[in-house]
Amino acid sequence: MQIDARRVLLTKGYGQGCRVIEVGKTDSKWQANEIWSRTPLLRTKFTSALVDGGVAYGLNDGILECVELDQGKRLWRQGRYGHGQVLLVEKNLVIASESGELAVVTADPSKPQVLARLPVLQGTTWNPLAVVGSQIYLRNAQEMARVDLQTDSDSL
């Protein structure tokens, strides 16, 4: 996941964690240098981390986590969602949990707030979710659902 023009965040599950590398070109030669690496952070599996400003959000072995990207410091970790999927929609994280639940959590580096939790699908849900306007589409191997998250301001 691109952080800025020179830095990239790499995340991996199975105990690997994450790292930030800086990529640059000097004298016609490309180089990649590791800035930091943290095994216990952002161990994503079946999903990717999301970068928003100077932080990343992601499911670390199923628990939602926020990590500051300059130093690789965990800012918070809370909520169990299994190996689901996460999207950043405006200022909110839309999460499809592994168990088929839909959650909306504020994308706030200081403190997350759960705005909604709703059981939607039954069974293991690993598929990516999609957002079209205020409509959220979720599916797994057995079923598909659409949830309207219309708000007072007509957007998430």
Language model regions located:
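Noncatalytic, solvent-exposed loop/strand surfaces
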Residues: M1-L156
